[in-house]
Amino acid sequence: MAQQQQQQMQQQQQHHTSSINNNNSSSIVLLQQQQPQQQQQQLDQLQQYNNNLYSQNYNMEEYERRKRREREKIERQQGIQIDDRETSLFGEPRRLTEGDAEITAALGEFFEAREYINNQTVGISRSAPGAGNPRLQPNLAPQAKSLGHSPSSASSAAGPTAASATTSLPGQQQHYQQQQRPPTYVKQADNKPPYNGRGGYPGQPMKNDIPSSSGMAPPRGPPRTSSSNSNSSSVTNNASSGGVPASTPLGPPLSTQMPNGREKSFLGPPAPALHNGTGGRFVPPAASKRPGVGQQPPPPEKDVNKIISDIANIFTVQPLTLIAATPHAPTRENYNLLAPNRQKYAMDIPSSPPSAEPSSLMTPLFAPITSPIAPLVTTPPQASQMPLGGATSGTILAGEALAPLHQLPPTMPKAASGVTSPGPVKPLKTEKNHSLEKQDSCLENDLELSESEDEQRKKEGRSGGNSSNSSESDSSESGSESSSKNDLQHHPNHQQHHHQLQQQQQQQQATMQQQQVLQQQHRSQPLTSNGAQNKKFRHEIIARGSNTITGLLSSSGFGSGGNVGPAGVNSNAVVGTGSGSGGTLSSGGSSSNKTPSPTESNKWNLSRFFHKPANQTNSESVSPGNVSMKVPGILPGGAQIIPESIDVTTAIVKNEKNDMAMEEGEEEDDDEEQQLRYGGGLSVTPVAVKKEAIDAVSEMALGAIPKTQIKRESAETLLSARLSDSGTSASGSSSSSSSSSDSAMGGEVVPMPGPGETLQLPGVPAAITTVMRVQPTQSQKAPPSNSVTLTPILPLPTSPKQRQKKPRKKKAITSAPILDSSDDDEPPPKHPGLDHTAVSVQTQPATDTVKKGRGRPRKQQQSGGSGNLSSASAGSSSQTKGPTLTAAKKPLAKTPLAMSRARKREHSSQSSSNGNTPTKKVATPQLVAAPLKPTSNTAGSSSSDEDSSSSAESSSKSSSSSSSSDDTETQNTNCRIVKLNKTGAVQKKALLGSGSSSPSSSGSEAEDQTTRSQVGSGQALAQQLPPYKQLPISQHSQHLSSSDCSSSSGGCTAVCSSSSGEEDEGRREKERERKPKSDKNKINTLTRIFNPKEGGAKKQGQVVIVDLQEEQQQGKLDAAAQPSAPQAPPAAPAAIMAKPRMTPTQQQQLGAGLASPARTTTPHLTSLICKIDLSKLSRERIMRLKKLTPAQQNGHLTPKDQATNAVHVPNGYAGDTNPAAKVKHEHPVKPEPELDAGYEAKFKPGNVKQEFQLKQERDRDRERERERERERERDREREQPPGRRRKRSSSSSSSPYKEKKRKKEKADQLQMGKELLPVPVLLPSNNHERMPNHDRLSYDKLQLLHEDAAAVIGDVSAPNGSPTKKLLAMSPLPPPPTVTVAPATCNEAVQTTPPSATATSAIAPPVPATRLIYRSYFDRDVEHPSDDPRKNNQFLQEAINRKHAADLERDSFNQVTLYLEAVVYFLLTADAMERCSSEQATNTMYKDTLSLIKFISTKFRPYQQQSTTNIQHETHNKVAILSLRCQSLISLKLYKLRRKDCRAIINSLTDFFRVGRGDIANGNTPSSISPSNSVGSQGSGSNTPPGRIVPPDIHNMLCKQNEFLSYLNSAHELWDQADRLVRTGNHIDFIRELDHENGPLTLHSTMHEVFRYVQAGLKTLRDAVSHPTHQSQ
């Protein structure tokens, strides 16, 4: 080992020399500045440097890898091979000039930090890209020096600190040695920016979105917190997994070494400085750390010396072991031996072999953390931040430690070491990076920081933990930091920082709950060293925090995702999104609480990154992963993390100020309960702690990364239980936290098994926990609360109070587990009315009992109507669920629907921490909450607000209070609270919204949220909850649509209530599989729809999707049964919107139609609120259903929803027996299909009251309309022209590919319809026999008024067993939709609606007889291709690219298909040229294309002549058919282009032949020439046959005519050839299927139709070749 180490050191030094070349001078300066410590460190430098170099090798670029290869060669020569040489892809160094601002700032900021980092900080994840790598962590001690040389910019920035930490002489010597040895092999740094392309080099190890655990340096170097984040996470995980063991033997010193392989634990702040320096961005935080003093003396040298001595004594041996172990860890990480990036992100050291060693290190790290914890207690902000940062991410710890050092120089030695130990613990690679990035980006403005972090996290969450995104790293670090801080501060600083910490805790509630559970587990297991029990406890939390906190953080934040990796399920996803979420949450918590906190400003994360003054601690991005809610700490914004007991089951972190002490006591119980519940399979729905400074856009982005953002406890048991409970239990809540970036950081949706599964809507910050799906049968009924309340809360006055809502404790263990960080500072004000009104005690243990209702009991209640157990993870929502549910229900019934709406909005806005708006409160007076006074938490909405607030807090919570409770109102604007009042079907759609997060957990939470919203806003909703459950399926559909809307609306908290029942779960899972595809499109569409600036709330606007029917029902129908019936129709529209098959336009239209009324109807919110009536959605959906019902809407509708809602009425048309409850049609809100030719029927109610009245009218009319609709369905089936159905099909065919896919999914149904239809019928008169959408819509418009009621009736009659009729009745064109399922794709002539309807819906309505649909040629859709030349150029480029690819293709089939694709793209180009280019150019393009396709056809001939029994020949024959069709149409087009010329030629020739002009060449005609000549002429003429002389012009015309007519002849001839080949080759089924899906291809087809048709055919053929069993006939 000694030789190997030396070799490695030399090689690494060589590597270092190259990486140091850029950072050498800066690192030398740092070394010189820190010579005293460096001398002490020199002894340790060698080993540390070796470790650092070793870790760097994994972060190196090509030259570094070459060095590593050289080193490996040497090792092989010595018989030593490094297991991880494959994995050690060195993170590319960030090349920064010595004068680089980032480096300068980092060095200056980290001047003292460097000393500490060199001496103490091993866990500076940013210092070395490899820091995040388990293998790198052991080496991080040397990395202090190597960081100075680390290839990554982060390492270069932090490297100087590290180098200074190591003696400048030894560093130089090492550099010299390195240069001496590897110069031959080592490729010097080439100044190339880190390669971020595939995440290959800097982030290559991050195959599974693990940033740089493969040892790659952050791609962007210091500025890239993301890459650093991955490193940080890797380091954290490695430190915890690889470094912790060393840490245990080493004790605190090892702990310091562990994060970066250097002695980071003692110099926690310097280590963060290194991380920041490494990140390069964190230089400003360093500056803020020492703003006035360029070099503040590090903590007393005693500490430094002690650290150095400890490192020298302990680290000397440990580094070898760590180094020896590192190869394994990197290899495993890079190659995902056990799980994708499991080891990288998994802080569960025991689970990951590479992390096994770090596990030991982690314990010592925590021990060191404990020592700093005392100072942390002394300086709560710094201490909490430092331990959190350390525990969560080395980078954060380093940055934070530095900042606290600056602020508290005397305390900082301990705090720094404590922070440093957390740094090694930082298992959340991304967390660390997030925190750093936030520091980098938004240090100056907490709100700005949190928002930017949200966006960054979104990106990084999406990148799945890629190290390329620094914001993710930063936010993750922040979140991890916050979590660690919360954990550290939990006991000593709990009350001190309670307000500040509350916000962070609320943001990180889920994380804290998980962490606290782990803490409790680990509390029983005292940490290795460092004295105080609190410290021990914190260290335990942190040490486990690597394992558990990181797991928790991983579930809560991106960075911590790694911990989940060992747990296995969402390791990768958790990491990427988790850190982003964590970062946002962390920053949100910081901002929301105390934006400027001198201690926080001293943090390395933000102050260093932003060069901010030490006192100006802008909210560091505290991502749930970064901030350890368990450890009390101060978040970057000054928010204190008061560790609240992590209730795993509750998944809500107690964060109420009043109950903080009690919460601490309860935390353990809650943690235990959470563990039990998780183990028990209950999905805990800790709603993500509300983050104050969340950008709605960031929210959306985070929402997109729900899984990665999922907080998961590192404890594998908890993770397993959680994961098993909700396939993405953490994802729901943590994704909500991550979606709300800032708002939902703490919130974590712990998957509640079965009905309690937690859904995380991707676009919805709030995690939705489905409470018990007690009434699967009821789910058939359309719950009155089909309404989706999407309340994106824009900057409302002061909504942080809502954040105060206690996370609802399941089983009342954690009274405020989910207390939203948003209101941490003002929890009492937030809930003055809310807490007192709904339960009067959100922050009190009594609330906990109420929260029991929130917990599992709430699921029980859900059956009772308040099924949103998880919906409001916050304690307030649990309060609502408890007694408030019934209270709310009664008032709601009594209160007018407007009141219920107001409550919904109020409590939505409140939950989005916009609850400050008294308007909302007033709107929801009906609630138990006489204390409407918490304006944001109106009395009525107090419980509802708690629910909404808990869910919204997890979602909007962060967004509204993203920066700080007070500050975030502006930022809150992005928040949306989507309250889906229907319980049954929500999970399916919640899944759609949830995206990657587990739909069930999200759905359950949504359900809870919905229930809470209903309960809070109108407790009558709670009464309706049983109807919701009764109609869970239809509700589910609606929830999905609203969920989609909310997620698409960006900030929208799509809370889908999925309490339908076990049936719904099965259906939801089916929908989960189907819907996600179209969910993205839907989300995009809905985002556009709801962007306040763009007529919607694109991640910013407030959208309230409310089922007006539901509200009306609540107001009108005290009985839940009636409300359930009216809500069934809204559920159907929701299903339509949620249905993945639905085309984006349809979704957009649906969303738009709903959005208009929503906006109009929700004046209560200060910010824009789009109130979408689901009943309206139902109509639109019904219209779509008309087209799509038979074929399951071609996937546009919600066939999945229907299947899932089989018991319910298909397509969200719950068979509600209560017609009154169903939304009639809101007649005032008429769909204006003509306005939107597609499906976008815009319902424009005159006002909210009118809508309510309409709903009430629906209640009356629905029963009548039931019969009417049944008759209409029959009549329509008979009468409605196929054209209309075609129309729908054509509109659906607007997205032919989606429709094709959907139809393929429903191939059986489609085939049924096809079989029923004769071929001629299947091929209608022409391709374009699609009724114009306008015509259809106009027809629909007329019928919508009728069908609105009919739809309600249909929903009501769905229980009667005629869902298809209902669908038809509900749909403006019920018969066409039935028939149109197949035609919906395009021009399908015939379609059987009843079969599709029956197939789609569990309830089999009477199947109408098969009907043939005939479409008129004039009904075809008129396409208006764009004249944009850019698009034409795009087509041309696509064609050229495909042709070149085909030229190089060797496989005959692939070549032919590529050529044919190129041809159709050329056709699109030529078609576009017809409108913007000359006729000649267009003609040339077509001619060239024809020549190309003729050339292609030569490749088919060999196969066409052979037997078609061969699959290959069959496929070639089919391609030949498509080719012949294309040739025919191109020939016809060439003729049409010349038709005018041809006509003129024909006229001229006709005249010529009629007049008989032209001389006879050899006749008796006398010659005018002389006789002598005449004889000769005659003699010569006698040689020519007699004939007529044709003038040249006539000859030319004849030639042209021949050419033109040959085109025409070829067109028909080629077409006939294709037809013959179809018949002879027995390919009729293949063509028929294409015709059904894309409309028949005829000689009238446009080039766009040809393109669509051919592309569909080629795709089918490719699929057939890839999967022969599935190839079409």
UniProtKB/Swiss-Prot annotation:
Residue ranges, compositional bias (Polar residues): 594-604, 775-788, 909-919, 1011-1022, 1190-1205
Q: Molecular function (GO) terms listed?
A: DNA binding; RNA polymerase II-specific DNA-binding transcription factor binding; transcription coregulator activity
Q: Could you tell me which residues belong to the region Disordered?
A: 1-24, 54-80, 125-302, 407-534, 575-604, 722-1086, 1114-1133, 1141-1160, 1187-1315, 1564-1588
Q: Which keywords does this chain's UniProt record carry? A: Developmental protein, DNA-binding, Nucleus, Pair-rule protein, Phosphoprotein, Transcription, Transcription regulation
Keyword field contains Transcription: yes
Write out the biased-composition intervals (Gly residues).
Answer: 577-586
Q: Which residues carry this modification: Phosphothreonine?
A: 420, 1364
For this entry, the protein name equals AF4/FMR2 family member lilli
| Protein's gene | lilli
